[in-house]
Regions:
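ATP-binding glycine-rich phosphate-binding loop
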Residues: 2-29
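C-terminal structured domain segments
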Residues: 223-254
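Active-site Asp-x-Gly
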Residues: 179-224
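ATP/Mg2+ or Mg2+-diphosphate-binding catalytic cores
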Residues: 123-127, 242-264
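Short acidic, S/G/P-rich loop/turn micro-motifs used as interaction or catalytic elements
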Residues: 39-41, 89-91, 175-177, 186-187, ...
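ATP-dependent phospho-/nucleotidyl transfer catalytic cores
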Residues: 14, 38-41, 113-169, 213-217, ...
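ATP-binding pocket architecture of kinase catalytic cores
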Residues: 28-110
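Active-site acidic catalytic loop and adjacent metal/ATP-binding pocket
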Residues: 154-197
Length: 264
């Protein structure tokens, strides 16, 4: 891998280390991550331009390093890789980190239709559970209960006029997530500004911790519109945590018994 980094990036680290995420190395005080890119290739330019916008507006994300050909992706042994320069990578994020990141408003006429996205996810999971549920007793017994929360969230979201601000958000935000994932530009998207805060609070709540003070502080510091409060509630109702775990179980990455802590 040293030869790859030397040739494509004109960087000459003394050592390269491999982890579950990919590879990393140091040059001086700077830490670089060389990781596989698994998402849609057509989205790469949009992600790169978005990360430049964030950096130019003093919002920290890991800096994407282009290769000698000026490309974000480097094709090695049949796989695409990206190189990122990181400053923050092993610190656990706090609620204040999440709230600050999502406080940067984007003025756009972009339409975010969470209702349709959630409905498609519900239908897909319901079909898979009906087909495979006999292998997973806890999944089979609990799915209808959480599906009802999902349907209620969809109905509420679809009834809202969406007088709400957009901001940069994340595909997923979890309590005690490390800063490597949080500031990874490939994890960032655009959504309503309450998205990250809600997902963080749900994750913290299901870790057995109180979230009341965080919610009160957030509401006091942010002038949410009426519609934003409703979107906040709809996202709170939608059981992201449960559906994510169901998908992991179906893929064989988790076990049916892992549901017990969530549903008992």
């Amino acid at each position: 891998m040293k030869n790859v980094i030397n040739f494509y990036y004109n960087l000459y680290p003394e050592n390269i280390f491999q982890t579950m995420r990919g590879y990393y190395f140091f040059i001086g005080k700077w830490r670089y991550f060389f990781v596989q890119y698994l998402d849609d290739i057509d989205e790469v330019k949009k992600i790169y331009d978005r990360h430049l916008y964030l950096l130019n507006n003093n919002i920290y994300v890991h800096h994407i390093i282009v290769n000698k050909d000026g490309n974000v992706l480097t094709f090695i042994d049949g796989k695409y890789y990206v190189l990122m320069l990181t400053v923050y990578y092993d610190k656990k994020i706090s609620f204040d980190d999440v709230a600050f990141f999502s406080s940067k408003i984007i003025f756009s006429d972009m339409v975010i239709n969470n209702g349709s996205i959630w409905a498609l996810k519900n239908d897909s999971l319901e079909y898979q559970v009906n087909m495979l549920g006999y292998n997973y007793p806890l999944m089979r017994e609990s799915f209808s209960y959480f599906l009802a929360f999902g349907e209620t969230a969809i109905q509420l979201f679809n009834s809202i006029e969406k007088n709400a601000f957009l901001s940069f958000s994340h595909k997923r935000v979890e309590y005690l997530e490390d800063s490597y994932d949080f500031y990874n530009p490939f994890n960032i998207l655009i959504d309503y500004r309450v998205r990250d805060v809600v997902e963080y609070l749900k994750s913290k709540f299901f870790s057995g911790l109180d979230i009341f003070d965080d919610m009160v502080n957030y509401f006091n510091k942010n002038n949410l519109s009426y519609d934003e409060y409703l979107i906040f509630l709809a996202r709170m109702l939608y059981p992201t945590y449960y559906f994510d775990l169901i998908e992991e179980i179906i893929k064989g990455k988790k076990k049916d018994d892992d549901l017990s802590e969530l549903i008992n």
